[in-house]
Amino acid sequence: EATKFKQGIVVAQVNEIVDEVPRVDIPGDWVDFVVQAPKPFYVEPLFTRDPALITDSQVLRAMMVIKGIYGEYGIQRLNHGIGFDTAAIELLLPTYGEELGLKGKICSYFSLNPHPTLIPAIESGWVKSVHSFGGEVGMEDYVAARPDVFFVGPDGTMRSNRAFSQTAGHYALDLFIGGTLQIDKYGNSSTA
């Protein structure tokens, strides 16, 4: 949609041309051309991270962020970027965050796509709501099953609003944290 804001041309490559789709991430009248691909195109998940690839240093940084930034400043509403650092934070909330007594005090409201690494925090009652920029391949059934957390329409599909999420993600939250945490040798973080 950023292309359309600058008078660009938007071309959508699709597997099949149909009369109706359940949902799209941008308004249909912003799409100038629809082209059917000669063979089905595999859509890779954008935000899914294999937890086995999270390193010890990423876990350490996640623990530092949970205790030293989120806990210290009472970060309730946040926009998590993508990457292993934020995935580690999400996975540590029900264990390390719980140990610190931070449940209900941090990380209750998110502006982000539905990350699988957020599931343990959702299921353990940490996360109250998630407003998404868009979808995530493979998360459709989980999102539909949790209309109490995600914005879901009457047909069971997720409702997202990229423009609203981007605005909220930058101006209506306690903190935006990027996919790469920058911490200097003195422990100062660019995210605080």
Question: Model-predicted segments: where are they?
Answer:
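Conserved phosphate- and dinucleotide-binding cores of soluble alpha/beta proteins
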Residues: 1-80, 84-104, 117-192
